[in-house]
Amino acid sequence: MKLIFGCDPAAFHFYKRLVAAMKKEGYEIEDVGCTSSEEPDGGKFAEIAEAVAEKVISGEGDYGFLMCGTGQGMAMAANKVPGIRAVLCYDVLPAVLSKNDNNGNILCTGAWMMEKQGIEFTMSMIKAWLFSSYTGTHEDGMAALKRLDDKKYEVR
């Protein structure tokens, strides 16, 4: 399983420790950024989210993981890419349910929240999400999301 990971400057230090711990356990991770906590953000979260989303949609990676300060910006940006179902979670049960029920393909979270829980807890949430499976019980909902992906809206 190949994972595509990304973060913005707000999450950099915690994220890098998390990636190192995941790699030490044998996970194949492509890290698409960022490169420093000193980078000016200026929308960096959106660029990183798009890069991860594109790699997931293209099949270059099986799943994505995004982290910023809260996870909110990353989830919003990733969900702009058609076909992406980015989910925002801070705990194991919502992470599992987001895969079981909603077939999430990118997990987002916030470093500011997860630092308090620690690396091990964050890894347990990611692993629980990765090894959960879509149950197929919400096919109507998945079809509705696909229609939204295909629909064009006029921005006012």
Question: What is each residue range found by the language model?
Answer:
Residues I48-L88:
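Helix-adjacent hinge/juxtasegments
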Residues H13-E25:
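Short, solvent-exposed amphipathic alpha-helices that sit
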